[in-house]
Design a protein with these regions (language model features):
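Conserved catalytic motifs of ABC-family nucleotide-binding domains
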Residues: 18
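Catalytic Walker B motif of ABC-type/P-loop ATPase nucleotide-binding domains
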Residues: 22-25
Length: 175
């Protein structure tokens, strides 16, 4: 059986005695994207049947599917709330940035004092800017001066992962 099939079988076995509470520890780690989606559809159906589900996951897109999430770093709670509220409370601006030199882009962006955090996110780099200290145009000019081409910059809405990354950074600075 594939990893996804094994997880779905394990979930089915856990449901035999019709539990009111289901605790799952990273159930989709190492599972292909299609099986992950199917697994979460199964969890949604179980939730609709009144089963309470507690899930630990490192996948922030999965955490965003939950009713309430606890963001945890090194065993400490950073925030507990709904995904929607966590994202709405996020104050800094975030830009999605791409150029033809991804590694150099990450290095250059991290040199900017206006940048609070900067990390790879899919094909782009997510750049967090505190207090609107830099505009898209200023960011574009900085990258052009540093030899970047094919630059794409877009202001974006934060994701749960963006919020987690920023809260993690703040926690590490406070310790």
């Amino acid at each position: 059986l594939s990893g996804g099939m094994k997880q779905k079988l394990a979930l089915s076995c856990a449901l035999i005695h019709k539990p009111k509470l289901l605790i799952l520890d990273e159930p989709t780690t190492g599972v292909d994207p299609v099986s992950r989606r199917e697994f979460w559809e199964m969890l949604q159906n179980l939730k609709n049947e009144g089963i309470t589900i507690l899930v630990s996951t490192a996948y922030m897109d999965e955490a965003g599917l939950c009713d309430t999430i606890a963001l945890i770093l090194n065993g400490e709670f950073l925030k507990i709330d709904t995904p929607k509220n966590i994202v709405q409370q996020f104050e800094p601006e975030i830009f999605s940035v791409q150029s033809n030199q991804r590694s150099k882009l990450l290095t250059d962006l991290r040199r900017l004092p206006e940048v609070s955090s900067c990390y790879a996110f899919g094909d782009s780099i997510h750049v967090t800017v505190e207090n609107k200290k830099i505009s898209e145009e200023e960011l574009q000019n900085f990258l052009l001066k540093n030899g970047h081409e094919q630059i794409e910059i877009a202001k974006i809405e934060p994701t749960v992962e963006d919020c987690f990354m920023e809260l993690s950074k703040q926690q590490e600075e406070n310790n």
